[in-house]
Amino acid sequence: MRTPPSTPAPEPEPAPVPVRARTGARLRAGDSVPVRTLDPVVGPPLVVPDSGRVVHVQFRRFAGCPVCNLHLRSVARRHEEIERAGIREVVFFHSPAEELREHVAHLPFAVVADPRKELYTAFGVEAHRRSLLDPRGWPGIVRGVCGGVVELLRGRGRLPAADQPGGRTGLPADFLIAPDGRITAAKYGEHVYDQWSVDELLALAAGPGPTDG
């Protein structure tokens, strides 16, 4: 009598690996990002993730963007409070460093130029007409333009360049990155002024766990 062939033992399942940033795809809380050394337009190089504190990464539009400036002024006013909460601010613009520097040199946190949008792509940050067409963003646009005029009259502001190779329809995005590289919170804006407020940022950094939105 012929002995039936034995059934081979199933191969063990591979061990799970950490989720890494997916190029061009939206990132979620729980994903992780690789270590990168960045060169701000003012100040020394910095490393993200930061081994000693949480990093708040913001993606904005172009140098001199009135809506971006409106929001960043609110961040600058409370920067000491943000730092006391153990949060480091890092802001990206898609303008060249030379152009960006004259607009942001006064800010108390790191600002990084990414004219090729390499980090925008890595974090899945998009541009779309709805950034300007969504009525929810219009109050921010009006306040940003009016605030920009006041800054110009005071001799502290600068007009943005007429030509914007990176476009004018970028959508904002916010990420909280833990020291181990995990994203603990992420938000992709639905219009030009859809980002975390400082109060929301502080609450998320002190919160119990990962969140999207």
List where the protein language model places each region.
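Structural microenvironment flanking redox-active thiols in thiol-disulfide oxidoreductases
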Residues: 71-122
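Cysteine/selenocysteine-centered motifs that mediate thiol-based redox chemistry or coordinate metal-sulfur cofactors
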Residues: 211-213
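Conserved beta-strand and immediately adjacent loop positions that scaffold enzyme active sites
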Residues: 35, 55, 173
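N-terminal "domain-start" segment that seeds a small globular fold
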Residues: 2-48, 74
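Residue-level preference for short coil/turn positions at secondary-structure junctions
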Residues: 51-52, 85, 170
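Thiol/selenol-based redox catalytic cores and closely related redox-interacting motifs
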Residues: 114-193
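A short, polar/charged loop-to-alpha-helix boundary motif
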Residues: 192-207
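Short active-site neighborhood of thiol/selenol oxidoreductases, capturing the structured segment around
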Residues: 47-76, 89-92
